[in-house]
């Protein structure tokens, strides 16, 4: 059982931070490649030790080779992997993930995403195994708590499903087969052009959504007739924001609230996973946000996972940086037990007993069809499915997931309705008090009793109906 790989990366100070007359210091003092001393805005000092610390002079290649390369290699061999960039807005997350751009970018500035794509296809082409590889690409963003397909904008509210054999799935998401890195990067560019961005006082091109790049790598072995499937997910999180620093208002402020809420949900999941001894009875609130639901497999342990905590080195942002580092330290305690997803190929899975059973069912249905109407046949097939005589494990798992989603949404809707009613009751009570005070001033005691009786009867009738 291994822990999550957690690294910190300090970007160079911005021109604004360099010009600031009140504070011109940096908040991190290096000790070695894994440890540094952090000084907060109150000048209190904390020592942090992580798997690796990338200081201001670090290169994109160094981050890739330590953080992403091992996970990418395992994904090609059937072990799921997840790489996440986390930090406040303007801390360098998108630069670390993409670089200045994922196409036509010099080698020095290439981000994790283009390096992973190139490395993945290089490993596939140099593989000594006699196998056929299939790579599929999907790309989604979580914007205002809706999952949008960035490769097909008509799919603006992708549903998240759970399958007992395949884990978390995005129902109906576009999956594009890609044969080489050039083709993959072209599709990624198309998706990135559709991502929601906006301008704030801290970032001229601030991501207004969480973005996930999903690669499914299937390896069909010719020799032993086995199929390995690895999922590789790269997640560029939107940054946590403080409205007084970003100057956000209107739509941008609402986006920031939603972003902060989902990041808070992520923190709650990590707290639940790392607080105290684990047991089957522990509730992990994966369903509190779309982000945590999509990351459920990674956070739950069936994936290698790496977290890059992107930080500002300036004392101007010391409180936000401290929060980011503490988040990383908590995530470091998540336990992971990733396992290779390997099954026999469809032909190898066929067994005489199952074939015989299917043939018998088929012959019975054919005989019955000879003497029954189409309507009767349809009804009988429905009964067979309902009674479990003929059924699909995948469809049954999907039904369970849909049921759970409906229950969760119903509870949320009811809670919202109760909250709204409570607000109305408070408003009516306030109005009642005002009327009572006015009546007392006007010496009209009868009106006080009438309004009190009206409020009481309305309140009672609602909760008894």
From Swiss-Prot:
A GO BP term here is:
megagametogenesis
The effect of disrupting this gene, in the record's words, is: Partial seed abortion due to defects in megagametogenesis. Defects in pollen viability.
Tell me the residue numbers annotated for binding ATP.
87-94
Tissue distribution is: Specifically expressed in ovules and anthers.
Can you list the disulfide-bonded cysteine pairs?
A: none
Q: What Pfam families does its record include?
A: Kinesin
Compositional bias ranges of the Basic and acidic residues kind: 341-358
Q: Which residues form a coiled coil?
A: 402-444
Query: What role does this protein play?
Result: Kinesin-like motor protein that promotes synapsis and is required for proper crossover distribution in meiosis. Plays a role in the nuclear division cycles during megagametogenesis.
| Record note on quaternary structure | Homodimer. Interacts with WIP1 and WIP2.
Its name, as the record gives it, is Kinesin-like protein KIN-1
Native organism is Arabidopsis thaliana (Mouse-ear cress)
The lineage is: Eukaryota, Viridiplantae, Streptophyta, Embryophyta, Tracheophyta
